[in-house]
Structure formats: structure tokens, C-alpha cells
Amino acid sequence: MAGHSKWANIKHRKGKADAKKGKIFSRIAKEIISAVKLGGADQKNNPRLRLALQKARDANMPNENIDRNIKKASSADQEDYHEMTYELYGHGGVGIVVDVMTDNKNRISSDMRIATNKRGGTVATPGAVTFNFDRKGILQISKKNAIEEELFLAATEAGAEDFEVDNDVFIITTDPSHLYSVKDAINHLGFACEEAELGMIPRTYVECSVETAKDNLALIEWLEELEDVDAVYHNMKIPEELENE
């Protein structure tokens, strides 16, 4: 199951943006509301809500915020959140996939047009970019919080597809339907998952010059700043000169 890290190429961009934006609570609130609307407020019977609540606790979201969002989801005045995926071509033929959760489709449509006008790139037809990505469950566990052999066996038995070691973390990928069962198996061992979420992993990567890569990263960061954007994925192989920026 081991191999080169398909996630490492993009995860540092996402993590950097999360820390910078201060959007974490807002995103988690939307996930809680959406999960309750789809599956009810009983987390025992709603794995999606259970994962959202774990994210809330990991992010130190106050309990009153969590309770307020659960109650908000049951209100008739609360608009439904729509999950959408935008596909873009960046600079140099790089494919970009944008996951959106919004209560205003017109707003995000306008925001996407402004982003491409300001930073370049074009909106692609549905399927033109995503065919080169696989949606997977992705879990990250710090090496200091787990024993590799025990983690590998538990994850494999629970349905994990891939197990990788990347610097100071173990990265486990699963079919989306097995994300919750693998996470529960890891938690049962007493190992803490630093991240457990659905994500898009490229099948192939595009190599770019440093300047083209900078243009793409500027576009990606602009997209990540948008209110309704949850995650941005790309298949650009980031030049070594930019990996730590």
C-alpha cells in the first residue's frame, strides 16, 4: 500500500490557507447544519454529523456554537446549503477543482467569474477536469500519536486503500464510503486523527515553470479566500523552489 505521497503535493497549500483565512469555524458550522438537515440531529445515526462534530472539537469550537448550529439547522428560516463543484483550467494546463458549499448560488457564480478575470484561468465544462481526479477519504495521523504496524493493520481491515508515510505523518486513503469506518477503527485503538475528510487526489500531475506555478498559486489562494469555498484541489506539481512558501 505504500507509495509516493499523492496528497503531500497539495495539502500544505490547503493547511496554510486554513490557518490564514480564519474560515475554519464558518466551514464547520456549514458542515454541521448540512449534516443535520440531511441526516438528523442524532449523531449516533448520522456519521456525517459525527465527523463534523469531531472537527468542531478538534478546532476548539465552543459548545454553545455547536449547539446553536444544530438548532439553526432545524429552523424553517435556515436556508439549505448546496454542495457544488466548479472545474477550472489554470495556467499551463493545470486542472483545478473547487468544492463549494453555499446558500446563494448566484453569489458564488459571480465570485468565480471575478476570480478568473482577476487571476486568469477559465471555467471548464463539467467533467473536463474531474475525470483526472479521484474523490477519496483522506486521514492524517501524526507519527507521535500512533504505532505504524497497529495503525496499518487496523486501517487495512477497516477498508483503507492506501497507507503512506510522509515526513511526520501517516496518510491513509479510503473509498469515500469507508472514511467513517476507518476513522472509527483508528480511534478505537486510541490513536487521534489530525484530519479526516473527503478530498480529491489527482491521477496525473502537470509540471510548470516557477513563474507559471506562482500564477496558479495566486489563483488558488484567491479562490480559497471566497466565502463559499470549502476546498481547492489541483494537479500542479509544485516546483521545489516554492514548496516551503
UniProtKB/Swiss-Prot annotation:
The keyword Nucleus does not apply. One of its GO terms (molecular function) is DNA binding. One of its GO terms (cellular component) is cytosol. Belongs to the TACO1 family. It is found in: Cytoplasm. GO terms for biological process: regulation of DNA-templated transcription. InterPro entries: Integrase-like_N, TACO1_YebC-like_2nd/3rd_dom, TACO1_YebC_N, Transcrip_reg_TACO1-like, Transcrip_reg_TACO1-like_dom3, YebC-like. Keywords: Cytoplasm, DNA-binding, Transcription, Transcription regulation. The keyword Manganese does not apply. It comes from Protochlamydia amoebophila (strain UWE25). Pfam families: TACO1_YebC_N, Transcrip_reg. Its main location: cytoplasm. It comes from the Bacteria. This is Probable transcriptional regulatory protein pc1328.
